[in-house]
Amino acid sequence: MTPIQKTATVGGKDILLETGKVAKQAHGSVWVRLGDSIVLVTAVSAAEKKEGIDFFPLTVDYQEKLFAAGRVPGSFFRREGRPTEKETLTSRLVDRSCRPLFAEGYSNETQVIATVISFDQENDTDVLALTGASAALHISDIPFGGPIAGVRVARVGGQLVANPTLAQRAEADLDVVMAASRDAIVMVEGGAQEVSEAVMIEALLFGQAAVQPLLDAQDALRAATGNKARRSFDPPKNDVELRAKVKALTWEKVKEAYGRNEKHDRYGRLSEIKKELLQALKDEAAGDAAKLATIALREKEIKGYYEDVKYDYMRKMITDERRRIGGRGMADIRKITCEVGLLPRVHGSSLFTRGETQALVATTLGTAEDEQRVEMLTGMVFKKFMLHYNFPPFSVGEVKFLRSPGRREIGHGALAERALRAVMPPEDQFPYTVRVVSDIMESNGSSSMASVCGGCLSLMDAGVPIKAPVAGIAMGLIKEGEKIAILSDILGDEDHLGDMDFKVCGTAAGITSIQMDIKIGGVTRDILEQALAQAAEGRKHILGEMAKALSAPRGSISAYAPRITTIKIRPERIKDIIGPGGKTIKDITARTGTSINIEDDGSVSIASPNQDKVEEAIKMIRGLTQEAEVGRIYLGTVRKIAEFGAFVEIFPGTDGLIHISELSDKRVKSVSDVLSEGEEVMVKVISVDRSGKIRLSRKEALADSAKKSEGTEPPKGEPAK
């Protein structure tokens, strides 16, 4: 096959889509290039459907090869290891964008693999993977309803930029990744520095317009590859008569169940209705072995019709009756309770409860040694702020094995972390490494938003001087024709059965994090404006409830948290603190029980829960790094006697020479006539040359002391007063 290339211009830069050159045995493969960043994306789908499942078995893997940036992995085996957080999050971005576009009922195992094979240190590769996934699926025979395309939108200096460079992103106050089709925004994920709702909407619409050339390029690529026919598959059965019977037997019962407030009560009743449905159909077929056998064979189909009844009733209840599960109104938020400081030995803690969703959140303050070190294409990255989200099975009343965090947990944690990172203090004001852990105690929707709220309270309880409190709210959308309902603080059912999951986090001043997944087309600007305005009102209500527990950061950190003090020394004196083989710094940390971190610029951070120990370590460091001042008088110790003079230690590690002529104003035959080793002597610094050699004078020190009527002897190693 001759390689085929198509180019699209986005944000003033060309993006190349190429197929037919590599990975030709994949059902679809596309090479995507922006600058010198290249991502290879492949799509393969099994020939036969996977039996016995009620979901679409799609797997998306995004992987970054370190050779792409000219780096050798730092692991023992020098191979890439488990996926990094960025790889996991990018895999989720692609999955969330593409999954809703596959044909309903298609259940063949499908895998999309995006591999970064070149990285130019300027153009990020996540949006290339997103566009490449759509292109690979679009040119294949897999029943995919694309194309879509990905773009990153940033606001730099007040101007919106499509696919900004890494340098531009560092200066941006808004940074979102989004996927869009010709007429709809499909997915949004990003953060901001307290921007307004109007700015966010402009960014989303700007991004949707920016991807249109990429959609044209994908259509052109598909046409050039022969417009492969989509493979056929068995669509879901639709027995109109059986569907109507299921509805007749369950509609009123479902109506009653959705009026129950308590989650497990409601779920229990809905499960009972399903059993009653199957039993009613079996009773109707009693005595007819063939009908009974048919019901047994079609049980999965019957359950599917029952799920459709639940779906239809809940949406009708919301759009027609303007009533939600449990009787709430469209903008109503569940009851909120907050508690802080409930874990006595933890640096900061909170318990945030909203309805039947509850998060127990703890904050730990650490030192620079606790930073997370991550090897990435851009080099070694150090994270000083982390938020980890855990979703144990007991939170939803289930029994499961406890495993390491999955993609969902990593994604929820990243969303909450991004929301709070925007208000974290700069390192020079608060030099701590901060770890926030959110454990979900119970869940019925919006647990990631509970983590944001609980995380904010926990940070304030720990005394972290955040810029402003942050809250999060999950919004939903039900759209039936012209009937539209926008829901605040959605439940799990409303998320599952709705058309949009829209999470918005921020302060009273603006948005700090956003995540949106839209399952339908045609979400207009008016709908986005209404949803964001309603989210802002809900966010402010939640902030008010949080303020009842704690309205601002505590004035001091926990008694059990390390106290960090930072001092500055001359960079060339760093070696004096470290000592040969680290001997000196190890001795200081062992004697004081402190943790010491030294930066190349001479910043020295000393940490310990005991402030007295910090001061002790500072005194030792000051002693090692003091600079001799010309004209100052010091009390020193004679370390060595020579024919021409004496070497005197004026403070630890720093010696100077008293020439024999500077011992006294009288002639001295031998140095040993005046001084002996180990003797303390008052000396004055008379010069320090370029190489750092110090000349001392005893006679000038004595003369100066005689002139002072009330002079006092200085402490050893310190200047005389």
From Swiss-Prot:
GO molecular function, one term: RNA binding
Residue positions binding Mg(2+): 495, 501
Highest taxon of the lineage: Bacteria
PROSITE patterns in the record: KH_TYPE_1 (PS50084), S1 (PS50126)
EC code: 2.7.7.8
UniProt cross-references to Gene3D superfamilies, sorted A to Z: GHMP Kinase, N-terminal domain, K Homology domain, type 1, Nucleic acid-binding proteins
Chain ranges of the S1 motif domain: 631-699
Main location: cytoplasm
Catalysis: reaction(s): RNA(n+1) + phosphate = RNA(n) + a ribonucleoside 5'-diphosphate
GO CC field: cytosol
InterPro entries: ExoRNase_PH_dom1 (IPR001247), ExoRNase_PH_dom2 (IPR015847), ExoRNase_PH_dom2_sf (IPR036345), KH_dom (IPR004087), KH_dom_type_1 (IPR004088), KH_dom_type_1_sf (IPR036612), NA-bd_OB-fold (IPR012340), PNPase (IPR012162)
Alphabetized UniProt keyword annotations: Cytoplasm, Magnesium, Metal-binding, Nucleotidyltransferase, RNA-binding, Transferase
Location of the protein in the cell: Cytoplasm
Keyword Cell wall biogenesis/degradation appears in the UniProt entry: no
Span of domain KH: 562-621
Family in the record: Belongs to the polyribonucleotide nucleotidyltransferase family.
Official protein name in the record: Polyribonucleotide nucleotidyltransferase
Native species: Anaeromyxobacter sp. (strain K)
Taxonomy of the source species: Bacteria, Pseudomonadati, Myxococcota, Myxococcia, Myxococcales
Gene: pnp
